[in-house]
Amino acid sequence: MKSVQFCFLFCCWRAICCRSCELTNITITVEKEECGFCISINTTWCAGYCYTRDLVYRDPARPNIQKTCTYKELVYETVKVPGCAHHADSLYTYPVATECQCGKCDGDSTDCTVRGLGPSYCSFSESRE
């Protein structure tokens, strides 16, 4: 019986501690209207588990804790989009996370929706690597 309890506790610890909010490599699709196509860029962003609590009922003494894995520090990098017309602005600036934290999602700078467009969304029919 103790081995079953140990296994359960170990799995819980692993799920919480080892899948915590951390930097991860992702590929995003970026587009420039002036260029008429999308390109894929590798960048770093935050992903993982954050403790959250959503009560079934409202209790002013115990507010809901809704934390998400989000950036603590950002830098911006710029890439030249190849193949744009000569008169078009071919530079694209995108965020790169350098440090992560579990915190409140800032809707002013982050897509906090349950189902956003996703990192591979492209509004043009043509996509280039």
UniProtKB/Swiss-Prot annotation:
Q: Which cysteines are joined by disulfide bonds?
A: C21-C69, C35-C84, C38-C122, C46-C100, C50-C102, C105-C112
Could you list the residue ranges that cross the membrane?
A: none
GO MF annotations, alphabetized: follicle-stimulating hormone activity
> What is the annotated signal peptide range for this record?
1-20
Q: What coarse category fits the chief subcellular location reported for this protein? A: secreted
Q: Name where it's found.
A: Secreted
Give the CC-aspect GO terms. cytoplasm; extracellular space; follicle-stimulating hormone complex
Glycosylation annotated at which residues? N25, N42
- UniProt keyword Secreted, yes or no: yes
Q: How does it assemble?
A: Heterodimer. The active follitropin is a heterodimer composed of an alpha chain/CGA shared with other hormones and a unique beta chain/FSHB shown here.
Instruction: Say which family it is in.
Output: Belongs to the glycoprotein hormones subunit beta family.
- Mind telling me what this protein is named? Follitropin subunit beta
Q: Which gene encodes it?
A: FSHB
